[in-house]
Regions:
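Conserved class I S-adenosyl-L-methionine
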Residues: 149-182
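N-terminal, positively charged/glycine-rich alpha-helical extensions of SAM-dependent methyltransferases
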Residues: 1-27
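Conserved alpha-helix/loop element of class I SAM-dependent methyltransferases that forms part
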Residues: 26-54
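A short glycine-rich, Lys/Arg-flanked "PGG" loop and its adjoining helix->strand segment in the class I
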Residues: 134-149
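A short acidic, Gly/Pro-enriched loop at the edge of an enzyme's catalytic core
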Residues: 109-120
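Short alpha-helix
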Residues: 192-215
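Class I SAM-dependent methyltransferase SAM/SAH-binding core
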Residues: 55-110
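A short SAM/SAH-binding and catalytic strip from SAM-dependent methyltransferases
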Residues: 120-134
Length: 254
């Protein structure tokens, strides 16, 4: 991701954040941590586990809904986001919750925080969708202590291959190439997105001392609703994986 991509995404999210929070804010979990476009409970998926007493960094925290919930569960939570406007929403929610969440205004490709300073780095879509993984993954590895956890959700490469730009929908046929995927630029002034083939993700993790513990291909529960996807797309996601969650461990070998 070039600095121009980071600047473009910052400008886009400063413009989109009010609409995003109005559309999705009430859907995003406020009482317990939930993952992804269908808000599957963390208590069911058990990706992060017990965060009490841990230093936790959220990549692309938006209005900090996740970080607030983790702070309420005893984490020393830090939320990082590229959008100043998102932080206006975050500060309001943090004040309402009465918890301590530190906010850092920066892109996940260049985090102004010291090495080996976190037990957990995680992201629910956010910066692992809108940041270049060739820069965000090394940053996560740099920030983690040995044995630390790196976990994030994002769209599957399969879903990216089935996305139709003209209609802005997910099709039941392959319309984009799988091999070579990396940077996706669609509409002018909209955020740039990123993804990789699965093999490239695994090579990238290994290159930076991250061992894959699990890959969860999320299947929406029957009858699930979403403010992010249509009913037709939810049915698609019950047949094929639309989003997935990687859980990696820093090995201490780097």
């Amino acid at each position: 991701m070039s600095s121009s991509d980071a600047e473009r995404n910052r400008a886009a999210w400063d413009r989109l954040s009010d609409e995003y929070q109005e559309r999705h804010g009430e859907f995003i979990g406020r009482t317990e941590p939930r993952w992804g476009m269908w808000q599957v409970p963390e208590s069911k998926l058990r990706i992060l586990g017990d965060v009490a007493g841990k230093d936790v960094l959220e990549f692309g925290c938006g209005a900090a809904q996740w970080s607030i919930l983790l702070a309420q569960r005893g984490a020393r939570a830090v939320g990082l986001d590229n959008s100043a406007r998102q932080f206006e929403h975050a500060r309001r929610l943090i004040a309402e919750a009465g918890v301590d969440v530190r906010l850092v205004h920066a892109a996940a490709e260049e985090v102004p925080l010291p090495d080996v300073s976190f037990d957990v780095v995680f992201c629910d879509h956010g910066a692992m969708t809108f940041g270049d993984p060739y820069r965000t993954v090394p940053e996560a590895a740099r920030l983690l202590r040995p044995g630390g956890l790196f976990a994030f959700s994002h769209l599957t490469p399969l879903a990216m291959c089935c996305w139709v730009e003209e209609t802005q929908t997910t099709d039941r046929r392959l319309v984009r190439p799988y091999f070579g995927m990396h940077r996706f630029e669609e509409l002018p002034d909209e955020p740039v997105e990123f993804n990789l083939p699965h093999g490239e993700w695994i090579r990238l993790f290994r290159a930076h001392g991250l061992r894959v513990e699990t890959l969860v291909e999320v299947r929406p529960p029957e009858g699930a609703e979403s403010s992010y996807r249509t009913a037709e797309e939810t049915e698609w996601a019950r047949d094929w994986p639309m989003e997935e969650i990687w859980r990696c461990r820093k090995t201490g070998e780097r």
